[in-house]
Amino acid sequence: MTWDDHKKNFARLARDGGYTIAQYAAEFNLNPNTARRYLRAFKEDTRTADSRKPNKPVRKPLKSMIIDHSNDQHAGDHIAAEIAEKQRVNAVVSAAVENAKRQNKRINDRSDDHDVINRAHRTLRDRLERDTLDDDGERFEFEAGDYLIDNVEARKAARAMLRRSGADVLETTLLEKSLSHLLMLENARDTCIRLVQEMRDQQKDDDEGTPPEYRIASMLNSCSAQISSLINTIYSIRNNYRKESREAEKHALSMGQAGIVKLAYERKRENNWSVLEAAEFIEAHGGKVPPLMLEQIKADLRAPKTNTDDEENQTASGAPSLEDLDKIARERAASRRADAALWIEHRREEIADIVDTGGYGDVDAEGISNEAWLEQDLDEDEEEDEEVTRKLYGDDD
């Protein structure tokens, strides 16, 4: 069909059923901008007298509405006049509404000499795709409202992610909706890019309008803003949930500490514990020792200690007895003697090792005998130390 044929066809459809340029372009698969440029001249005079919207009731000038009430017999005449005016206005409005209903009915009941756009129940993937004609010859219109349809696959993916992260019921619901919306938005973005690419391939050289690249850039900007908003929403939900979890843990910990302190005081009374033992019990169970108990422990540590286990062996001043001191002294002396004997034995072993390995004994370091040196006479100013010789070699030597 040429544009002249389109002009005649659009003029007839617009005159019979109130067709718009956008509906005509979508039905006949035309470029909306090009169709609007060629068919705009036929839009102004296509409406009939019945299809035009009724004019609003003209309000009378203020001077003509002034009523002389000098001859009114009753005060109710003013109210009756107002009621009559309201009834007249309501009648005009009712007539306009009825006229609009008749107009819509004529549009819906238009003649069947042209194709009608039909929409069938399809899956999300099919609804996001723009089909030309199916097997039955029906045309499916592509609308932006298809993106708002709930995506079952996106919901399942969101639930799987939330099960791995761990969340409560309220947070799960909010994050599930946000994540599914994010996944559907990404799916819609990819589908729009593919559709624009197909449109660019099908676009003719003489068609003018918005370039496909500009549409892709505009769509990507919108998707980026929406994705950033959804990410911020998910991040804020997670932060709020973690904050509430920390507050709940602090509250539970404070309540648990109160129970631990109460249990420690009960055990202290039952088992006759000291304050220090009660404090150890509280710390062992992860509690915090109360300030009063800390002050009592400090006071007990500052007080002088007295040993009253054996009062018979204690002096008047509380010092240990002489028998205890003598016993302690004997034990320390025996310990010192044992340490001295052990030290002497260790030193002898070190000296013997030095003599044997350094060549100062009967055999030098190379295994040669030192008898020649031992048989030499002493110098005039040297004397033999018999005591040392006896200790080293014995009496037989």
UniProtKB/Swiss-Prot annotation:
* Function field: Necessary for recognition and cleavage of the phage packaging site (pac), together with the pacB protein. Both are probably the two major subunits of the phage PACase.
Question: Residue ranges of region Disordered?
Answer: 43-62, 304-325, 356-397
Describe its partners and assembly state. Answer: Multimer of two distinct subunits.
Q: Where is the composition biased (Acidic residues)?
A: 374-387
Top-level taxon: Viruses
- Its name, as the record gives it, is Terminase A protein
Native source organism of the sequence: Enterobacteria phage P7
Q: Name one GO molecular function term.
A: nuclease activity
Lineage runs: Viruses, Duplodnaviria, Heunggongvirae, Uroviricota, Caudoviricetes
Which keywords, in A-to-Z order, does the entry hold?
DNA-binding, Hydrolase, Nuclease
User: Which spans does this entry mark as compositional bias, Basic and acidic residues?
Assistant: 43-53, 388-397
